[in-house]
């Protein structure tokens, strides 16, 4: 079995590399003779990262986790909201370490190199530092920390010099490797906070310990005593320029240390660890250990010097609030290939996975041969991809892909009935047309009906999402546009804040399950600025491209087949009802994007269309002017589609939008632009007009003297002509001296000619239309736009 074949530690995958690491580690320690602390030269800069496991099936993934991950500590820290509580940063996993009393060194060594400190290299370096170097600074910091502790403050305990020296000598003995009589029956004595502080100075690298604040009972969960080990340990005995600023992250629970490592290529989250705890309705900074009083006043500065501190947004406790918290950036995997044990373990896992798959397939085939009527454990054949049936909550299987077991059985039943129904020759017996359907109603593709009873789910239960949904590759941002938070699969792809906001808005509607958002495509559920019969331009282009193949099979074109490999679509729950219908049976809500009533927007005067920045009016049914034009256009098309053929509802002679880098379709109603680009162009035109309005007025003022001066010049003698004479000696202008030959025979020079003054361009910049006096020099369109939005 794979459980027995997979090694229980990383170093067991390649013993040669493990030996090479153990040889290099002691050689890298530098021990000065002038009293300076012992320290590593280069090997303290390495960092381990775990490989991805989402490509394996859930059963084999569980085998990997059982071999390498300490599930008890991980679950304990996560349940206490100390680990992985922030969705904006990458998830950390706890690797197993030996519980022999040297777990602090095991965890630190494994975080950097992938091997445990079985040779006691780190423990010997710690002991030699405490014995052979100047430790007065360490002792002074330890005394300050002890005096501030709860034992001294609450009990009023006072130590004299002899007591302090005895306690310090005891701490040095605890770090020794020669401990035949260790406490608690362990091979080595457990270490304390001061040992972590000395260790981070030996490594010249910060250490962050994630731990609970209280020691709790394993049975009742009651508090025993406060825990002080959690917090930040900075290498304060070194200048920040000589330290490695990426911290080592350890977890501590039940008197045991484990390394907390990130997963390689795990998703879009930030590779960082929060420097705060979320507890009791507030964010509390992690404690920075062993600071002197002057250093405590400049704690923020020290953190930014020794760590790469960044700010990340997190959701506040109150609804709609956002907080910026500090987080320390984590290092990525940088082990050289000759000492990288993760790559070797991953190759071994891939090899064992192939063997495990072959054994599983062979076992299923033998079981099916013994009892053909019995299904061969369909749960073991589940894949991490949703069933292709619209709105089906189950996952597809290896044997029934691209459908789940339920939909596959229903399709087989329907196919068995089709030959009987379609036995008639001629048009009535076309495949894909169901007899007994209403006129013009085509055969509907298989869709999930939540009301249909099933005899027990052979697939994954809909109330328990697949572990794949929580894996590292599905970590995506919230579906709400502009929201910086990470989604929660339990909230239908939204973060907690946006989900609560949607719940509040949905409570005002009587039947929100049938409520369609005109700002969303009904096929791919994406937020769009313009829809065509309820679908976005991308899905519309796809349906028109598939029109020929759809007509050949007499099936209605499906709106949009979602990609099976797109993880963002896996976490989005489809609409409770299907919109894939055709003909007269199509509900108006699925074809139109304007099914809302003004009562749904009570308390606000914003436009009814989602994402529109303008305000609506009661005359336009709650829409702004532009959205109301689009609403009337789509409503007219919906009314006409009921009388036309199924293919008549498609738009003909569509043109792409004239906007730059815009892939949507344009509309003649918006001068060839889509609605979004039209609004942007009008806004730009309006701002340019507003910006240059003063310049235009000043130019008009300058033109006034010129016109008054020109009026003093002699005009044409003809009463109907207002032209200015080119020469003072003449009585008629050049136009009257040479009449237009195209004048009709009934016209003569004595008749007054119609006035046709020269036209003037619109005052708005970049406008090709002509202005008029009624609109103050603007064209009708720009003047109306200026009246509406100016």
Swiss-Prot record:
Residues binding Zn(2+) 1, per UniProt: 387, 392, 404, 407
Record's comment on post-translational modification: Proteolytically cleaved by MALT1 upon TCR stimulation; disrupts NF-kappa-B inhibitory function and results in increased IL-2 production. It is proposed that only a fraction of TNFAIP3 colocalized with TCR and CBM complex is cleaved, leaving the main TNFAIP3 pool intact.
Region Interaction with TNIP1, residue ranges: 369-775
Binding-site list for Zn(2+) 5: 657, 662, 674, 677
One CC-aspect GO term: lysosome
Catalytic activity field: Thiol-dependent hydrolysis of ester, thioester, amide, peptide and isopeptide bonds formed by the C-terminal Gly of ubiquitin (a 76-residue protein attached to proteins as an intracellular targeting signal)
Start-end of Polar residues biased regions: 566-576
InterPro entries per UniProt: OTU_Deubiquitinase, OTU_dom, Znf_A20
UniProt name for this protein: Tumor necrosis factor alpha-induced protein 3
Native source species: Macaca fascicularis (Crab-eating macaque)
Gene (name only): TNFAIP3
């Amino acid at each position: 079995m794979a459980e027995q074949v997979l090694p229980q530690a990383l170093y067991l995958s390649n013993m040669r590399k493990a030996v090479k690491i153990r040889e290099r580690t002691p050689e890298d320690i530098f021990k000065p003779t002038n009293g300076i602390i012992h320290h590593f030269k280069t090997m303290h800069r390495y960092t381990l990262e775990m490989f991805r496991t989402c490509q394996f099936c859930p059963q084999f993934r569980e085998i990997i986790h059982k071999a390498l991950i300490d599930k008890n500590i991980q679950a304990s820290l996560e349940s206490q909201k100390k680990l992985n509580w922030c969705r904006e940063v990458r998830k950390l996993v706890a690797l197993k370490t030996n519980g022999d009393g040297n777990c602090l060194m095991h965890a630190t060594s494994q975080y950097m190199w992938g091997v445990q400190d079985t040779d006691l290299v780190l423990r010997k370096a710690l002991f030699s530092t405490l014995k052979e170097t100047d430790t007065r600074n360490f002792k002074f910091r330890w005394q300050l920390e002890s005096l501030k502790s709860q034992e001294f403050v609450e009990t009023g305990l006072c130590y004299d010099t002899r007591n302090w020296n005895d306690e310090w000598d005891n701490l040095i003995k605890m770090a020794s490797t020669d401990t035949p009589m260790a406490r608690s029956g362990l091979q080595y004595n457990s270490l304390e906070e001061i040992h972590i502080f000395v260790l981070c100075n030996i490594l010249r690298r910060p250490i962050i310990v994630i731990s609970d604040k209280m020691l709790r009972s394993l049975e009742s969960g009651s508090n025993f005593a406060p825990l002080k080990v959690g917090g930040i340990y900075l290498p304060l005995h070194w200048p920040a320029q000589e330290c490695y600023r990426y911290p080592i992250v350890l977890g501590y629970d039940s008197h045991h240390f484990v390394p907390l490592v990130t997963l390689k290529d795990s998703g879009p989250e930030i590779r960082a660890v929060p420097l705060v705890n979320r507890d009791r309705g507030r964010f509390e900074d992690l404690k920075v250990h062993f600071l002197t009083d002057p250093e405590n006043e400049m704690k923020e500065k020290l953190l930014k010097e020794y760590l790469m501190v960044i700010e990340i947004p997190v959701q506040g406790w109150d609804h709609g609030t956002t907080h910026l918290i500090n987080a320390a950036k984590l290092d990525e995997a940088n082990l050289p290939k000759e000492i990288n044990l993760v790559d070797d373990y991953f190759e071994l896992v891939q090899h064992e996975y192939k063997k495990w798959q072959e054994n599983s397939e062979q076992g299923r085939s033998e079981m099916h041969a013994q009892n053909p009527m019995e299904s061969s454990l369909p749960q073991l054949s589940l894949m991490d991809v949703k069933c292709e049936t619209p709105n089906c909550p189950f996952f597809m299987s290896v044997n029934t892909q691209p459908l789940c077991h339920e939909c596959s059985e229903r399709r087989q039943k329907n196919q068995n009935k089709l030959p009987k129904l379609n036995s008639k020759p001629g048009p009535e017996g076309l495949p894909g047309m169901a007899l007994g359907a209403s006129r013009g109603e085509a055969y509907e593709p298989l869709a999930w009906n939540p009301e249909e009873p099933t005899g027990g789910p052979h697939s994954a239960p809909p109330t328990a999402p697949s572990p794949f949904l929580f894996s590292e590759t599905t970590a995506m941002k919230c579906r709400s546009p502009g929201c910086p938070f990470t989604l929660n699969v339990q909230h239908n792809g939204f973060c907690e804040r946006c989900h609560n906001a949607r719940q509040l808005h949905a409570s005002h509607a009587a039947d929100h399950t049938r409520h369609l958002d005109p700002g969303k495509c009904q096929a791919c559920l994406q937020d769009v600025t313009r829809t065509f019969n309820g679908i976005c331009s991308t899905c519309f282009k796809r349906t028109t491209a598939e029109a020929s193949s759809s007509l050949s099979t007499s099936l209605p074109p499906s709106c949009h087949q979602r990609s099976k490999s797109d993880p963002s679509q896996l976490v989005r729950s489809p609409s409770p009802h299907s919109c894939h219908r055709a003909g007269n049976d199509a509900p108006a809500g699925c074809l139109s994007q304007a099914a809302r009533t003004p009562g749904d927007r009570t308390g606000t005067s914003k436009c009814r269309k989602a994402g529109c920045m303008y305000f609506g009016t009661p005359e336009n049914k709650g829409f702004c002017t532009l959205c109301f034009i689009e609403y009337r256009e789509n409503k007219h098309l919906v009314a006409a589609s009921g009388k036309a053929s199924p293919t008549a509802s498609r738009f003909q002679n569509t043109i792409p939008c004239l906007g730059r880098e815009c892939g949507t379709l344009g509309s003649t109603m918006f001068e060839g632009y889509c609605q979004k680009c039209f609004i942007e162009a009008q806004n730009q035109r309006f701002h340019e007009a507003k910006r240059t309005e003063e310049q235009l007025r000043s130019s008009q003022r300058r033109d006034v003297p010129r016109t008054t001066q020109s009026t003093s010049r002699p005009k044409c003698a003809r009463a109907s002509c207002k032209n200015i004479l080119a020469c003072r000696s003449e009585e008629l202008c050049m136009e009257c001296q040479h009449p237009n030959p195209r004048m009709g025979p009934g016209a003569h020079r004595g008749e007054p000619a119609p006035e046709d003054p020269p036209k003037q361009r619109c005052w708005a910049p970049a406008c090709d239309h002509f202005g008029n006096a009624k609109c103050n020099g603007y064209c009708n369109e720009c003047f109306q736009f200026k009246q509406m939005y100016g």
